[in-house]
Amino acid sequence: MLNIKWIRENQELFDEKLSQRFIEPMSSKIAMLDREKRKITSLIQEFQHARKVKSKILGNMVSKSGEEFEELQRDVNHINEKLEELEQTLDNNNELNELLNMLPNIPDEEVPYGIDESMNKLVRSYGNTNKNALNKQHFELGTKLNLMDFEQTAKISGSRFVTLKGDLAKLERALINFMVDIHTKEFDFFEISPPLLVRDSAMYNAGQLPKFSEESFITTNGYRLIPTAEVSLVNIVADTIIQREKLPMRYVAYTTCFRSEAGSSGRDTRGMIRLHQFGKVELVSITTPEESKNEHEYITNASETILKKLDLPYRVMLLCTGDMGFAAKKTYDIEVWLPGQNQYREIASCSNCGDFQARRMKARYKEFGSNETTLVHTLNASGLPIGRTIVAILENYQNNDGSITIPDVLINYMGGLKKITTYSE
């Protein structure tokens, strides 16, 4: 959620930043609603003070009868009625909060202006995209190996699901262990095994609700299936005050994730690129406003390191204002090279959310010996999605005979296996 005080004091700049996100100016409407809310709040405080004064006088009166006592009692009753009326008005006047809840984060000054992904800015690239001239797509390779099943899986679950078998299932498990090991041992992330079912309040805190309600699955008793472990991880610090010396707090988790893919009809209908259910290693950092810029580079480097160790060609793109996620103030997308598609595809998103999520979930920190609190900054990164990493390995490590060479760094995780070949049932 955005800072209403900042909006109040920077109305022109606020509208300018909204325009970069292709949203109409809203400062005038927000300022009007804010004035109304503050006026009601001020009246409530005045009546509460008057009630306190009169109630104290009533309590100190020797005689609990007589005209003066009864008049004061009537005054207190009248104040209570007015307070109830004003508090009800305040509760019913949700327009300001509803408006603020639908507004995305303000872009950082370093974020380039742009309409869509075509205007993102190249930051750096790694690896040789021409090292393998073979160009079969992952679903062709996986199906031919008899280790990737879409047809039978569709009978079980419908479209956008896959079953991995044999050595591809083993590769999935190897990648999970490899990624978590790198993040915990080399980058000092603390491993978490979080819940996959969360309340709406947790989704709201992470910026998933109310705007993206249709993009998640909801159970019959009202729980949401997490679209990313970011939801569970950032909420670890919800409604807490953290001692400054404990920051940064870095978390890593592998979870299954679930997305309805609403609005993705017709996109990536074949293969493993866009599934309803997929595994992902997620990184989350909690830090101070002063350190969040450096932490953004740190968490992005952690994601890049996985691709470097796997020797997969990739590039890092700074997203423009029109392509950033809702809660992010600045985002790097890491795109891996896929020979089968002859293009780069997103494999990781690394975002600095500033205090946007922290304001929603009341996550703060304070210096030792101080009572003053400050909102933390939250950051997240994919580190990485397992399915898309398998896609990249299949396409970049394919051989003429249809077999797949195991990247050197994964051989021990695969029990010494160096090549994936056709499985015969």
UniProtKB/Swiss-Prot annotation:
InterPro entries: aa-tRNA-synt_IIb, aa-tRNA-synth_II, aa-tRNA-synth_II/BPL/LPL, Ser-tRNA-ligase_type_1, Ser-tRNA-synth_1_N, SerRS_1_N_sf, SerRS_core, tRNA-bd_arm. L-serine binds at T228, A229, E230, E282, S382. One of its GO terms (molecular function) is ATP binding. Catalyzes the attachment of serine to tRNA(Ser). Is also able to aminoacylate tRNA(Sec) with serine, to form the misacylated tRNA L-seryl-tRNA(Sec), which will be further converted into selenocysteinyl-tRNA(Sec). It comes from Rickettsia typhi (strain ATCC VR-144 / Wilmington). ATP binds at R259, S260, E261, E346, I347, A348, S349. Consists of two distinct domains, a catalytic core and a N-terminal extension that is involved in tRNA binding. PROSITE patterns: AA_TRNA_LIGASE_II (PS50862). Belongs to the class-II aminoacyl-tRNA synthetase family. Type-1 seryl-tRNA synthetase subfamily. CDD domains: SerRS_core. GO terms for cellular component: cytoplasm. Keywords: Aminoacyl-tRNA synthetase, ATP-binding, Cytoplasm, Ligase, Nucleotide-binding, Protein biosynthesis. Pfam families: Seryl_tRNA_N, tRNA-synt_2b. It is found in: Cytoplasm. It catalyses: tRNA(Ser) + L-serine + ATP = L-seryl-tRNA(Ser) + AMP + diphosphate + H(+); tRNA(Sec) + L-serine + ATP = L-seryl-tRNA(Sec) + AMP + diphosphate + H(+). Its EC number is 6.1.1.11. It comes from the Bacteria. Pathway: Aminoacyl-tRNA biosynthesis; selenocysteinyl-tRNA(Sec) biosynthesis; L-seryl-tRNA(Sec) from L-serine and tRNA(Sec): step 1/1. Homodimer. The tRNA molecule binds across the dimer. This is Serine--tRNA ligase.
